[in-house]
Amino acid sequence: MDTDKIIQDLNRRFAAPLPEFYQRRIIFWYDEDKEFQDKLDEVVLENAKVIALTGNNAFSVKKLLSVDDLTTNYLVYSPCVYNRPDDNWLLDVELYSEEFRADLISIWMDEMGLISNPAMRKQVKNYRAYFNAKDRRLKVSTQNKVPETPAQLHMAVMAAICGLKDAQPNMILRSVFQEGLDLNNNTVYQDFVKYHADAAFWAMVRQGCGFVEEEPDLGQLAIHLLLTAATRTMRQEYLAGLDSFISIPHQAYCYDFISEWLHSDNITQLYDVARYVEDKARLYQRFEKLTVEDLVGTECFPCINEVILTKLMTEISDHIIDVDTITNTVEKRRTCVWYEPFENFYDGILQVANMQSFFKEHSAGFHTAEAKSIWKEYTESYYQMDTYYRLFHLSFQKSLETSNILLDDLFKHVVDKVEGLYTHWFLGELGNNWSDVCADELATYGKVLEVPQQEDFYRSRIQTSDTKVFVIISDAMRYEVAATMADQLQRETQSKVSISSMQSIFPSTTKFGMAALLPHKELTVEVWNDILTVLADGQSTASTYRDKVLKKEDSASVALKYNDIIAMKRAERSALVKGMDVVYIYHDTIDEASHTSDTAVFAACDKAISELKNLVRIIVNEFGGTNILITADHGFLYTYSPLKEEDKVDKRGFFDVNVTNSDITKKESIKRCVEYGRRYAIMQKGVQPDYLMPVKFLGGNTEFDGFAPRESIRIKMNGGGMNFVHGGISLQEMVVPVIEYHYLRNDSMEYKRNKQKYDTKPVTVNLLSANRKISNMIFSLNFYQKDAVSTNREAAIYQVYFTDEDGKQISDIQKIIADKTSDNGAERTFRCQFNLKSLKYSNTATYYLVIADEQGLQLPQREPFQIDIAFAVDEFDFFS
């Protein structure tokens, strides 16, 4: 500010009206840097005298102002700096006088609303390069808290450079790391250097983290931070030899910093930083020597997942499957931050544990004497083995999309073990038992007695319905897939859902299964152009004729395709079902996927479930349907591993052995074998192919006989498609699901009477531990899931942490995935370890344990606690 402007401003202020009770005006002009000392003689005011403090005339000036002259206006020029208030003899006069500053630092401080004192002025001068731009000054003045001390000003400048509104050390440090570990290319750090904030940054790091290095190095700092944090959940002896990177006195701060970052929205850079530390400290090689139990509680290093999975998958490959260890480990690790990149591997070995548990329950094999009893066992429990196998291979296929060099081959070895459990033991043992006990009934009747039949579907389910009925037929949706969907429909919709089964017609192929589901008195076959065609009362049942067959029985019927419906506008598809009593909707996702690739089938099962649930919503919300049946034409048999020769039967018995000419052989094969697939053969009567079971074909009212391989054996054929098959008599192929879905309107009597039963709610988690007093910075608590996940109780995820009375978080966050299905309450418990932040805690204050639904749909639970820790420390007072 130039002298003329100073004189103008001072004249204006002295000319202003005096405050009440004031007889004159005294203004102190502070100029600690003595910028205007040489220009003071130029300052001549209209209505005030000018006097200057020299450092030696304080007494005479005070006498002048307080005794000698009580009426004249004075401008007191003060270039003095006092170390203590007592050194300032004019302090009492200053307190009732006005203040004026004309130096740049003072103007900046006034602009930013900073307290003016020597210490603050010193730091503003230190950051002169930063404050030289108005937009940068604005970043400091508009922070959530205006700095009041030099320490706070250091933080504020660093926070402003980082683009932060809160000057928190953790966020400043995180912002630096997010720009990379190379100081030369780290834009935030280079700005610290540019604006002289780098010294403050390293002072903050030294005080908070205990990191001291002669040469600044973010890589070394990262190693120090993560290793020190790890000692909070891992015994320090496991990191022996790395002691120079660990500061136990700063353990709490380092753990808090890493924990907060782990549970923030932006953890991508932390993953890279953690990987860097793992590499430099050779942590993978170190952790390999530890046990799973030693590692399972530490989450900051991604490689811990690789070590744990390597150990567990190696054991599985060596035929050591500890169900409890695998289950408990996955339970613990799935709440960790770095779980997602390894989720497919963990899910896979969890299914191995489920399969092993099933194996232990049935290790004696399957020796049921009656076919209907095996059928009952399969539909009540045995089918779960098919589900475990499907879920395992879903995880395995997904893992192939995101390669992990350490785990990929190991997972493939696990696949071999799974194939042994499922294909050789389960399908072999159960298939052998089933083939033995059903052979006579299939040969004599073509069906299992006392089991509902697919051929009776329309007669027993549709004709007897007194309301409009929608029938969804999903090609190749086997029973276990339908069971999964039924469970989801029950939990996700306001409905009454049940699942039952019926035996598919033989052979369990699309054209026969689809025909069996149509109205008919009799199914017959004819050979048209060398192709076996299925007729319902003389009418073709091919896809283009199904609408006609339905309308013949009931004119208010219609056959639709799922793909057509989905592509239509709402009004268009609603018009198609208007006035109809029976609506058949054909869905083909699973079987269609098998035509592309056998390995795509299990993923298609998941897709089919999603599509069918959506179709149910369309029927309910757009078509007004309340009565829906979901079924299939047949199931399927799938095994991943290549089949061995002993898993196949030759079809030489299908042909006339005396014919050698290839053309004649072809004609003879058509004559002797009307149709065959990998799992069935339809032969001319009298033909007895080797190694196949006879199955009475269409009640014996045709000129053909049916045959099927035992167990999961395939008939040799050219081409692919050996792994995904259907048409045979295995339980996986023949057990056809029937889901009965009844939507319950709010005004329905069933819903009103059983509202508690049908309303789906998330399961809740409560504190089990009785003690409400905390006496250590690290402690554990037990929790329990109140209800088991069931038809009307869905899984939920909870975040659990501690807060003070004002709601400020004072601990790390623990996650509880409440999805336990056991009816045994002791099996629905969780144990969480908490780490309190480095704060000062009062034993008279109330603190709260918060149990919060991750989706925020429920009111958080708050349990009061007392904290009594004798040596708890306060937050770091940085730069003190």
Where do the language-model regions lie?
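…; additionally, a secondary subgroup of soluble metalloenzymes is captured
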Residues: 1-468, 478-628, 632-880
